[in-house]
Amino acid sequence: MPGLLLCEPTELYNILNQATKLSRLTDPNYLCLLDVRSKWEYDESHVITALRVKKKNNEYLLPESVDLECVKYCVVYDNNSSTLEILLKDDDDDSDSDGDGKDLVPQAAIEYGRILTRLTHHPVYILKGGYERFSGTYHFLRTQKIIWMPQELDAFQPYPIEIVPGKVFVGNFSQACDPKIQKDLKIKAHVNVSMDTGPFFAGDADKLLHIRIEDSPEAQILPFLRHMCHFIEIHHHLGSVILIFSTQGISRSCAAIIAYLMHSNEQTLQRSWAYVKKCKNNMCPNRGLVSQLLEWEKTILGDSITNIMDPLY
């Protein structure tokens, strides 16, 4: 039986913003997001697409019209759960007390999550810090909307994927040119790994690094990697949030962030690749870029360690 796992706010943010041609939220078997707070709290605001968990005779009801056996991600949140441990709660009724004045009480999200683990094939995630922490960081993903029509989910515009929490995002050219996204994510610097240019970046010489390479296996990204890492580090020290982007946000920009993680953490291509793949499911650098990342690994670690002949790459 699958168990409970804690889900960091950045993980839920990335789950909500996965996309292929359309947002993954269009797939009814992709995400079941459940809010176990009170009705008035839910009505005041909740995370987009979240369903309110109802009670009858003081018992939680299962969500309607959701096949939990088929759902890939089942995420539950309350106000502020931050641990999977059972909490001690003061007991004011001396007659039922065991003498220490406290009872063992699971928080609402954990209590409901345990019920769901009997019905799912995948782990049930408890949002760490609950709604309070998530909405404090990603306020733009709050809503009062309760019912989402299929065409509304089709039209949902995902945000860039968060790679280094609060510091580095990866996206596409369209997202990079969207003023609302720049404002919501507090983007202050850009790394453009494409041939595309636009008026949005005019006059931004100190805040824009443009690596002009084609989307082809012959494109050479290796000569730019050291300068790119230096550019990102400078903006980290300045406290700037950085968006790395390419035309589709799948190949060149992902190769760039993998290279940065290898440099920043002094780690293998394999480890950096796995981390970015977990954050951004449709990541797919072309074979030419993968070969250059192996060369970059040799530069960073003194040897080529990752086997890029593995089908993973």
Curated annotation (Swiss-Prot):
Transmembrane segments: none annotated. Residues 159-302 form the Tyrosine-protein phosphatase domain. Keywords: Mitochondrion. Residues 27-138 form the Rhodanese domain. Its main location: mitochondrion. SUPFAM superfamilies: (Phosphotyrosine protein) phosphatases II (SSF52799), Rhodanese/Cell cycle control phosphatase (SSF52821). Disulfide bonds: none annotated. Gene3D superfamilies: Protein tyrosine phosphatase superfamily (3.90.190.10), Rhodanese-like domain (3.40.250.10). GO terms for biological process: intracellular signal transduction; negative regulation of stress granule assembly; positive regulation of intrinsic apoptotic signaling pathway; positive regulation of neuron projection development; regulation of intrinsic apoptotic signaling pathway. Coiled coil: none annotated. The keyword Mitochondrion applies. GO terms for cellular component: mitochondrial matrix; mitochondrion. The keyword NAD does not apply. SMART domains: DSPc (SM00195), RHOD (SM00450). PROSITE patterns: TYR_PHOSPHATASE_DUAL (PS50054). Belongs to the protein-tyrosine phosphatase family. Non-receptor class subfamily. Interacts with G3BP1. Interacts with PTPMT1; the interaction inhibits PTPMT1 catalytic activity. Catalytically inactive phosphatase. By binding to G3BP1, inhibits the formation of G3BP1-induced stress granules. Does not act by protecting the dephosphorylation of G3BP1 at 'Ser-149'. Inhibits PTPMT1 phosphatase activity. By inhibiting PTPMT1, positively regulates intrinsic apoptosis. May play a role in the formation of neurites during neuronal development. This is Serine/threonine/tyrosine-interacting-like protein 1. It comes from Homo sapiens (Human). The lineage of its organism: Eukaryota, Metazoa, Chordata, Craniata, Vertebrata.
